[in-house]
């Protein structure tokens, strides 16, 4: 998959465009720490920002050094550590992704993990 990665000043984040038509903006704001339930509630009615999917976070993790360099160059905050995804594993667990390697695992939804907002949409 070919990617275009650049800073988007309108969203204060990194804009990733894929050759499959996915457009993903990663917030340059710091990651928050909260439970999965709190993260889902926090982004529930947000029209722009959302909790990323496992696929989105693994795409970001695959190019994390380049993405973090762009974030740093524009005064934003690097992405590190384990981040919640919007994807549930089962009734009690949800998926989270290690941004320093791309590994995904499930963990209890009541546990606190990092959360970084994305804005995702399909261009075509």
List each model region and its residues.
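Extracellular adhesion/carbohydrate-recognition regions
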Residues: 1-49, 81, 85, 93-96, ...
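C-terminal, surface-exposed recognition/capping segments
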Residues: 54-124
